[in-house]
């Protein structure tokens, strides 16, 4: 029996911990209007500007996933690339920015790509304290997130204690941290490792309320996309759709269903 199959079985048995926040007290939303804390910046921040066409297309994706007035619209969503190099972190960063500009409640973007973290670089902040540290610690999640400006956008970076921490993405501490984030933020966007790198993306996809797959135009293979869809469906993850980067538009359901 393969290791991946055994892990999928484990994920199925542990679904209750994904779906509930048992034992967690309700938390008040963070003070969105408060000024951000001062964090030491590392290097020069990467540019966050988007071309008008890029912004319009990512806006369509955000509206489709979060803001279409669905009775059960997802609040916790994983974004994961089919393979490495699809630009998933770029898409996640900008989708979080746009979502925060469209809603009043707090939005948190989480760097769960412990193998190759990048969100902190896009936002121009350090990576000294974040998810990996939270998985090893007992402090409330509010001690690990940081505001990203006067807007209602917050970051849970990868953190400094990421060595060999990727295995904890399918651990009880990770499930409890996600349940805590759900209670603390209105929306949570999670930048996950690429599907081709192992079980992490599948585990996080099952933990969340939905998954958006990111493909790269003229690069992502159809076979890899089909396998990613099958793996997520086997794990019981809800696939919300896909985004084709470097053309950057949501793939219509009629096309996505043929993957």
Residue spans for each PLM region:
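P-loop NTP-binding module
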Residues: 1-259
């Amino acid at each position: 029996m393969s290791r991946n199959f055994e892990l999928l079985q484990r994920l199925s048995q542990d679904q209750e911990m994904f779906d509930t926040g048992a034992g967690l007290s309700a938390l008040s939303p963070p003070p969105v209007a408060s000024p951000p804390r001062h964090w030491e910046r590392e290097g020069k921040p990467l540019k966050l500007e988007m071309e008008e066409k890029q912004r319009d297309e990512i806006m369509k994706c955000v509206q489709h996933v979060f803001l279409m007035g669905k009775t059960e619209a997802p609040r916790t969503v994983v974004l994961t690339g089919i393979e490495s190099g699809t630009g998933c972190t770029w898409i996640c960063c900008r989708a979080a920015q746009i979502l925060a500009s469209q809603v009043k409640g707090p939005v948190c973007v989480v760097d769960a790509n412990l193998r190759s973290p990048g969100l902190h670089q896009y936002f121009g902040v350090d990576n000294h304290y974040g998810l990996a540290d939270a998985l090893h610690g007992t402090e409330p999640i509010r001690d690990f997130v940081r505001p990203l400006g006067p807007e209602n956008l917050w970051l849970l970076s990868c953190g400094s204690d990421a060595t060999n921490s990727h295995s904890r993405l399918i651990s009880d501490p990770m499930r409890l941290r996600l349940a805590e984030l759900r209670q603390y933020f209105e929306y949570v966007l999670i930048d996950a490792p690429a599907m081709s790198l192992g079980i992490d993306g599948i585990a996080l996809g099952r933990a969340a309320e939905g998954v958006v797959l990111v493909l790269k135009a003229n690069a992502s293979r159809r076979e890899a996309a089909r396998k990613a869809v099958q793996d997520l469906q086997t794990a019981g993850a809800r696939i919300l759709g896909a985004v084709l980067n470097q053309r950057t538009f949501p793939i219509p359901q009629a096309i996505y269903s043929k993957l």
